[in-house]
UniProtKB/Swiss-Prot annotation:
PROSITE patterns attached to this UniProt entry: AMP_BINDING (PS00455), CARRIER (PS50075)
Upper classification of the organism: Eukaryota, Fungi, Dikarya, Ascomycota, Pezizomycotina
MF GO annotations: ligase activity; oxidoreductase activity
Keywords linked to the UniProt accession: Ligase, Multifunctional enzyme, Oxidoreductase, Phosphopantetheine, Phosphoprotein
PANTHER family (UniProt xref): BETA-ALANINE-ACTIVATING ENZYME (PTHR44845:SF6), CARRIER DOMAIN-CONTAINING PROTEIN (PTHR44845)
Residue positions, PTM O-(pantetheine 4'-phosphoryl)serine: S568
Family assignment from sequence similarity: Belongs to the NRP synthetase family.
Chain ranges of the Carrier domain: 526-608
This protein's pathway: Secondary metabolite biosynthesis
Enzyme class name: ligase
Biotechnological exploitation: Hancockiamide D displays potent cytotoxic activity against murine myeloma NS-1 cells, suggesting a potential antitumour application. More interestingly, hancockiamide C, the likely end metabolite of the hkm pathway, shows potent Arabidopsis thaliana seed anti-germination activity, but is inactive against the monocot Eragrostis tef seed, suggesting that it could be a herbicidal lead targeting monocots. The herbicidal activity of hancockiamide C could be due to its phenylpropanoid-like structural features, which may act on the plant lignan pathways, and hence warrants further investigations.
Protein name: Non-canonical nonribosomal peptide synthetase hkm10
Length: 1020
């Protein structure tokens, strides 16, 4: 009896099988993503905790639960939790529009969704449970926990949507039996405990079932690979080596792409399963010449057969013959070829492939008609008990060889696979024609002749008589709004659609015409470029012509690579060709940032000229700097409760600054705080005390009774030992109960490099203090400026407190060095939080004066702005801009309250106005200031304001004038780029404050408060 048959006999579901692996080796790594990993025990604990939350409702057996979670560890946690509770996972691509997600879940009558932080504010109309990135101690899970619930292998574990637009998509039922079968036949031998299986496929793909569940039920490990990593071949190859990946399921186009520049990157692996498109023989030959994996497998399988059902181990003999079959049925699956009447056909004749066995789905949900047509019984095929097999009609035309292998011929219908996605061409045609711009339209998959470029969807369309000149652009926008990204075709306008002799669309003629045009375009462009002495622009144009099938004879500087239909795979190919042609590196991120021909030529020229300060170089430097804390050892032992009577010793940085002074004053007033050690730049303690005293006196905060509690610590952030010396550093590390890190260099005109020593290296040094000796919480004060102008650059509508920072990276080049340093410092801390460092992050908006006394910082930007605008009689009219004003006393009291609870650790908190209505726009604020000061300050254009500012004798804003006047992109300055600011979600903050109703309410910066500020500034 095989292992699979033994498991069938035991009939334990996926949850129990994972649980058994956890019991056998709880400390084994279950899943890793960068520096963040979960052991089997940790994954079990998190899944159990989430299952309990899910099961508090009237949860029923096989309840469909939507998963709207980004690719990574939390998605695996969500799936295990749902199965632990006895439900069914409905894996959904978070990139889908809300409308499509709603339709899919409503058709399943789903009531619940699991979401992560980036997706929790989408407003999806279902009962929502957040998958939190929190460590759950295994000790908190009772030994008599009901999870996982007892399930059989016939339990419906997943619903995978396949094919078509949302209204036409089919939800394929997957049962545990099918997944266990895949895990034990991968495809010729099982996944084993020593394997590391790559998880690079979207969880909306059935292939991701193999990525996640094959290792989990077999006791192996999962290594998460992002899409960006897969498309950056250098990073992809490094990830294989770093994680020691041994097994991977990958789409054929990615394999083909790797073959162009790194054909040997799979040589260390045990199994590589490729599918989605036909094997590219020249590309595969390169891989075999460079060193293939032990098993290079051409795998075939529609979703209805759970990942794959036929497979062929590719051999040199296959490559010599020029044809790689889709192999034979694997494991306990069976296959046959039938004619249109459902009767078997002889070997060598074309027919439809039918597949049966443990991998076949029970059918689609709520689609009895499609089930009757697609899932049938063949009387001549029976099992050992004489029962006819449940067979799936694949719709694929194949031929069976005498040795039992199957050769793929084509499709009965016009369903195709593009980059691993199955696409109904008719669904695209429907949306295309619904635009009303075309009288006829045909969508096809066309294979590109360019090396490694793969296939593309092309729509051939005849313009309607009333179509506007913008028909193609408008139609593309309509398609983008209605369909997933992989279903958006390149639209080619034709005079008529050719027909065959049988009055059917002549798809072959259309494909030939498209390829001829592509080849003609390539030749035309290449003929225009001399072999030597050609400009960078012309050489890049030739490279574009070898990749893109566009009707353009000569590209202009404003032509956009992606606007012309370039895909992410083609972008990777372009990067490789640029490297080969120009002997210079341009990263994928740089290409996305500079995707027009003119921009890209400029980037290539600058790289060749040795220019170092390009946007991409800066971004790579920032990313590298986020990793300088990775060598720090994770603190051990429980985190000190700093509010205990026997503790109360605070280490504070930045105490001489505006926020630090108010926070220090608040802490010195607290009876439970016994001493505050302040890191201060001073040659001796006496000078240090004077500096601290002066900082508090500046805002009328100093009290003589503070002196016994005040401990000056003379040092500096940039020094590894904080300027204290190693011995004193270790003494303070043991002395301190908690750390508040507010110290930073803040200069709006200096670059990142100037901020790096204090703000980045200094943060690492403070973290080192926190994890030296006793494990102490670190509370870090950042700013909402760490996101940069993400609203205008990324179109970000909402910034989540615990959301990923990486999506905002491409907004940072357009902000000042301080904001850039805050992003780096936060991402550095985020990496440490993932390693369970006890850290909390606080992001205030623009901090204004005290709500009672009016005491404010006369040197901050807002105070300088008030003085300058009052002097010149105008202010810049900036629509849709807010500063998110928060009074200083609200900021410090909020920080102290939140920091007093250990629940704050591992989270970020936006300290901003609680509601949008309490955050006035800048234009309204400046207008109100004019009324209160009795001056006539009028809104003017930003350019006019800068001109007025440049000629005034008022020096308030002169130090900031270079930053204010510098144009950074598209004619806009840094301040102008904060138009259409996102909402800074503050759920964590409001939840924490709700636990203490005695805290004062948020003091909105309104007319009364502005009057206090103006009075204070007038006296100072």
């Amino acid at each position: 009896m095989s292992t699979f048959e033994s498991l069938l006999a035991r009939n334990e579901g996926l949850g129990q099988l994972f649980y058994q692996q956890m019991l056998e080796d709880p400390d084994a790594i279950a899943i890793v993503d960068g520096d963040y990993s979960l052991t089997y025990a940790s994954l079990h604990a998190q899944a159990t905790h989430l299952a309990q939350r899910l099961d508090q409702n009237d949860f029923v057996h096989e309840e469909p639960v939507g998963i709207v979670v980004q690719h990574g560890i939390l998605d695996a946690v969500a799936q295990v939790a749902i199965i632990y509770a006895g439900g069914t996972c409905v894996t959904l691509d978070p990139a889908l529009p809300n409308q499509q997600i709603e339709r899919r879940l409503n058709r399943l009558r789903a009531r619940y969704i699991l979401v992560d932080t980036p997706n929790k504010s989408r407003g999806l109309p279902f009962s929502q449970i957040e998958v939190e990135d929190l460590p759950i101690s295994t000790e908190l899970i009772p030994t008599d926990s009901p999870y996982p619930v007892n399930l059989s292998l016939e339990h419906r574990s997943h619903l995978i949507h396949t094919s078509g637009t949302t209204s036409e998509s089919k939800a394929v039922q997957i049962v545990g039996r099918s997944i266990v079968h895949v895990a034990n036949y991968a495809p010729f031998e099982p996944v084993v405990k020593t394997d590391v299986v790559a998880h690079g496929n979207s969880t909306s793909f059935d292939v991701a079932l193999f990525d996640i569940w094959a290792p989990l039920v077999q006791g192996a490990s999962i290594a998460v690979l992002s899409k960006a990593t897969l498309l950056d071949l250098s990073a992809f190859e490094a990830a294989i080596d770093r994680y020691k990946i041994s097994v991977m399921a990958i789409t054929a186009p990615l394999v083909n792409l790797a073959a162009t520049t790194r054909p040997g990157m799979f040589s260390s692996m045990r199994v590589v399963l490729m599918g989605g498109e036909a094997v590219n023989i020249p590309a595969m030959r390169k891989i075999f010449e460079a060193g293939p994996p032990v098993h290079m497998v051409n795998a075939y399988g529609p979703t209805e057969c759970c990942v794959y059902c036929l497979a062929r181990k590719i051999t040199l003999e296959d490559l010599d013959t020029g044809a790689v079959s889709i192999g034979k049925a694997i494991g306990n699956n069976i296959a046959t070829v039938c004619d249109e009447m459902g009767k078997p056909v002889p070997d060598g004749e074309e027919g439809e492939l039918l597949v049966g066995g443990p991998g076949v789905s029970p059918g689609y949900v709520n689609l009895p008609g499609k089930n009757a047509a697609s899932f049938i019984e063949v009387p001549d095929l029976v099992d050992a008990n004489g029962t006819p097999y449940h067979m799936y009609r694949t719709g694929d035309l194949v031929k069976r060889r005498p040795d039992g292998q199957y050769d793929f011929v084509g499709r009965f219908d016009h369903q195709v696979k593009i980059r691993g996605y199955r696409v109904e061409l008719g669904a695209i045609e429907t949306v295309l024609m619904d635009t009303g711009y075309f009288s006829e339209g045909v969508v096809m998959k066309v294979d590109s002749k360019a090396e490694g470029a793969g296939s593309a969807l092309v729509a051939f369309a005849v313009l309607a008589p009333t179509a506007p000149p913008s028909a193609v652009t408008d139609a593309t926008a309509a398609l983008t709004a209605a369909l997933p990204h992989y279903m958006i075709p390149n639209i080619h306008i034709v005079e008529s659609i050719p027909l065959t002799n049988h009055a059917k669309v002549d798809r072959k003629q259309l494909a030939d015409w498209c390829l001829q045009r592509q080849e003609k375009n390539m030749c035309a462009m290449q003929d225009k470029v001399p072999s030597e002495g050609a400009s960078t622009r012309d050489q890049l144009g030739a490279l574009w012509a070898t990749i893109l099938a566009t009707p353009v004879r000569e590209y202009s500087d404003n032509d956009d690579f992606f606007g012309l239909g370039g895909t992410s795979l083609q972008a990777s190919l372009l990067i490789s060709l640029i490297r080969r042609t120009f002997n210079t590196e341009v990263s994928l991120l740089a290409l996305y940032d500079n995707s027009t021909l003119g921009q890209l030529a400029h980037i290539v020229d600058r790289n060749q000229g040795g220019a170092l300060a390009t946007v991409q170089n800066l971004r790579e430097m920032w990313i590298a700097d986020t990793m300088i804390g990775d060598a720090l050892e994770t603190p051990v032992g429980p985190v000190v409760d700093w509010r205990r009577d026997t503790e109360g010793r605070v280490f504070l940085t930045g105490a001489t600054g505006f926020v630090g002074a108010f926070l220090l004053s608040d802490m010195l007033k607290m009876p439970g705080i016994h001493q505050v050690g302040c890191l201060v730049r001073a040659p001796d303690e006496a000078t240090g005390v004077r500096r601290l005293r002066h900082a508090l006196e500046k805002y009328n905060l100093w009290r003589e009774e503070y002196l016994p509690k005040l401990l000056p610590l003379c040092g500096k952030l940039e020094d590894p030992w904080l300027g204290l010396g190693e011995q004193r550093f270790r003494e303070i590390a043991d002395w301190a109960s908690v750390i508040f890190h507010l110290g930073a260099l803040v200069n709006y005109t200096q670059p990142y490099s100037w901020h790096r020593p204090a703000n980045i290296e200094g943060t690492v040094n403070v973290v080192r203090l926190a994890c030296t000796g006793r494990s102490k919480a670190l509370h870090y004060c950042s700013s909402i400026s760490c996101f940069g102008p993400t609203g205008i650059i990324n179109g970000t509508k909402v910034v989540h407190e615990d959301g990923a920072l990486m999506p905002h990276l491409n907004a940072l080049p357009y902000d000042h060095g301080y904001a850039q340093s805050q992003w780096v410092a936060e991402e550095l801390l985020r990496r440490l939080i993932h390693r369970r460092f006890p850290i909390a992050v606080y992001r205030p908006g623009f901090i204004t004066g005290h709500s009672e006394t009016g005491a404010c910082n006369p040197d901050d930007f807002f105070s300088r702005l008030i003085r300058a605008c009052s002097s010149i009689g105008c202010y810049p009219g900036l629509p849709n801009q807010r500063k998110e004003f928060v009074p200083i006393d609200y900021v410090t009291s909020t920080m102290i309250h939140i920091a007093s609870s250990s629940l704050s650790l591992g989270h970020a908190f936006h300290i901003v106005p609680p509601t949008r209505e309490e955050s006035p726009e800048m234009n309204d604020t400046m207008s109100l200031i004019g009324e209160l000061t009795g001056t006539s300050i009028q809104p003017v254009s930003y350019r006019e304001w800068i001109e007025q500012l440049s000629s005034t004798k008022d020096l308030s804003l002169q130090p900031l004038l270079p930053m204010l006047a510098e144009v950074v992109i598209d004619g806009m300055t840094r301040w102008e780029m904060y138009e259409n600011m996102p909402t800074y979600e503050n759920t964590n903050t409001l939840r924490a404050l709700a636990s203490c109703p005695d805290l004062p309410k948020f003091p909105m910066v309104d007319e009364a408060l502005l009057r206090k500020y103006l009075d204070y500034l007038a006296d100072h």
